[in-house]
């Protein structure tokens, strides 16, 4: 089952640090066979607060997403961004909806 890392930024205070982080984070994403599905772009909040940036990365499995996040490569990238962005990061697995007969 595929795994996903989801990051919805609440605030970005240093765009240069974000760019530096992105370069290093990409190395870890590629190492763990991740694929960016959403990275930035225009967004509209229909409910709740709007976000300046959203990122969704798909991995071959939940375990691979977990390994990516805990990897030395990603943690080095994460250190660059500390104090320069507020963002919850979570990882999840794909669950197919159960369709109930009518």
Pin down the residues of each PLM region.
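Short S/T/G/P-rich N-terminal loop/turn motif that feeds into the first structured element of a domain
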Residues: 1-53, 60-66, 70, 94
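C-terminal structural segments of small proteins and small subunits
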Residues: 75-82
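Short, mixed-charge low-complexity intrinsically disordered segments
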Residues: 86-88
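Conserved small/polar residues in nucleotide/adenosyl-binding loops
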Residues: 92-98
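Cationic, low-complexity basic patches in intrinsically disordered or flexible, solvent-exposed regions
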Residues: 101
């Amino acid at each position: 089952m595929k795994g996903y890392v989801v990051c919805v930024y609440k605030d970005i205070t240093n765009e240069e640090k974000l760019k530096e982080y992105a370069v290093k984070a990409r190395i870890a994403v590629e190492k763990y066979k991740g694929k960016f599905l959403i990275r930035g772009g225009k967004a509209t909040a229909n409910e709740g607060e709007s976000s300046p940036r959203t990122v969704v990365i798909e991995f071959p499995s939940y375990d691979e997403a977990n390994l990516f996040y805990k990897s030395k490569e990603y943690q080095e990238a994460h250190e660059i961004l500390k104090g320069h962005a507020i963002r919850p990061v979570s990882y999840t697995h794909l669950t197919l909806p159960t369709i109930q007969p009518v």
